Amino acid sequence: MTPVALYSPDPARGWLPWVWLTPILMILFNAVPVIALDGWMQSQHWSTPRGDPIGLAGLHALLWIGFAPTLAAVLAWARLVEGSSLASIGLTGPAPLKTFLRGLAVGFGTVALVVVTIWMAGGMQAAGLGQAWRSPVSLLHIGLLLASFMFQASVEEVIFRGWMLSVVARKTNVAVAVLLVSLVFCFLHFSPHQPPMVMLSTFLFSLFACAWARWTGNIWGVMGWHAGWNWLLATGFELPVTGMDAHLPALLVALRPQGLDTLTGGAQGPEGSYLCSVFFVAAIVWIQWRKTRVPHNVSLTSR
């Protein structure tokens, strides 16, 4: 395979970093703001010394304040150092809002499919139906969380599947780019004592997102999917998303895990279940199969 411009033929008018430098830059773009803001976040009682969010306010702070500086740093680097256009990092294509919203709907559907599959396998027990609808305040918070997760998910897609994937692909090839992006994505989501199944699911999550972006030729759809996945998982079932609790009643059905952590995902939530990994493998295979049947730049969410 040869170097390729994934999203746009627009040339970089500045300097593209060496391949070995891109993971270091990505880690710095994420780590420096976290370290700089850690003391202040703790002083506001928004995070613990380990960096975990405290309550609903802490979750909002993490999703906005924790990700905004990273987005600003990556966009500034892409524009000022590389001279890259927004199109070259995946923010291109017709009807971006429509594509994003369709991706959002796919996110709702796919995470619901995973949760229902775990429940049917005996890993979940229902403990209440639509309790959030009894509280207007809870519904308001759930709506605000949708905006927060839309921002957080969009930032992650811009920096990983947008900027990093496109830069490495221009310097090497698509296979190396997908592998490197997914490894760095895993590294930045790693926490001590995390079960191997969780890391496998995180790696497959990134492979799936890369496959989607690679096929559609933009990141609008996968941005929406990522947001829909995180939000409904956090608010729909009273289950943790990547180990974080929204502290809100369920929008759909309150579920309680039962059985082995390999089935339920344990403290990490359904993303730590082997059934979630099975879903990602099947979805990646489906995308690869679809690529042989429809044109490369047809949106995944346009059918």
Where are the language model's segments positioned?
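N-terminal, membrane-interfacial amphipathic/helix-forming hydrophobic leader that caps
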Residues: M1-L86, A234-R303
